Amino acid sequence: MPTDNRQTFSMRYDDNLTATLPSFVTHLECAFTGEQHAADQIHNLSRAGKPLLVRYDLDGVRKALSKDKLAARPADLWRYRELLPVRRPEDIVSLGEAMTPVVRMPRLGAKLGGGELLVKDEGRLPTGSFKARGLVMAVSMAKALGIRHMAMPTNGNAGAALAAYATRAGIKTT
């Protein structure tokens, strides 16, 4: 397997991507009104115009997952599958999202007069930006929900990530 995290396309064949695992996502909820929505249906904002938050079966998570169990899995985004909204392995759209390192920045931390400064190096994600984390989920869910066209008002990293993942999934973008 390649050592460069950007070239780990073979990871799509590992158990994180192909195993059928339970999902502990129970529903979506408006934090403002408490209104609940099914997690496996297309939604927009709540009636109050607020984003919908993911809710989980936390007792189920505690019983099924442990730090040791998660640590034993391949180090990629999909090691947390049971906590992600994508339920069926065939709906996963992946470009090889590896875990990204936290880099110590002692000189900059000292220059800023603070304590230890750590920076998460998300530039190692397949599209070179932290935007890949959210858009891999958005496109995977779009695929699961049968969406065939996606649009996003951006000319930056989010647009590049959407284009990359949607192309991988065969979803048209505007």
Go through each PLM region and give its residues.
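PLP-dependent amino-acid enzyme catalytic core
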Residues: 2, 6-174
